[in-house]
């Protein structure tokens, strides 16, 4: 690995230090490497409810830059029941937590990782991705890390089109007023949160892409267009849509 590559250290839930990781921190720091600290606070887990998990999330950020000497922190509040980062509560933890960090420590670099419930080739996956992209952009994150579709647990269930949609939504909402953002998010999350139990885990990469040309299939582009139309109706429009 190059020094410029991110070298990962993971915190244990919640706010636990693992002595084996300390050796890695020391090695990375002495070698002058980029250190990426990762932690996924669990809503409904050890921390408790929304407010408590948000406090833990802020503390995890601070822990990353102090104890683990991080160059940047990769967040990922996850819902205990659904195992995703796109549930309403997980988004609230991520948004409020990072907003608090940005208010007091705007020079700290933060990111968030994406684990939607639905898989590639589905409108729901793209809408979940959009909700988190909006939350991350408008709470001040510098890095978006995604998309691990189908909760990141199904083999070969992720493609580049989800990441493209994530980036487009980030650009589309940058600079929008927070009161407008909250209205959009409330309406957007309501479109998919009732379908977590029956969510489609989607298709494989080879089913979503022409593997020779490395481009999405016409079928997947139709799904993408449906998601774009929904976002436009909500007031979100990227320049190429």
Where on the chain are the PLM-derived regions?
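Long, compositionally biased intrinsically disordered regions
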Residues: 169-241
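Helix N-terminus capping/helix-initiation residues
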Residues: 48-50, 159, 177-178, 217
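Context-gated lysine
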Residues: 3, 16, 104, 151-157, ...
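Helix-rich catalytic cores of soluble enzyme domains
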Residues: 1-138, 142, 151-156, 163-171
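Active-site and donor-binding regions of nucleotide-sugar-utilizing enzymes
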Residues: 147
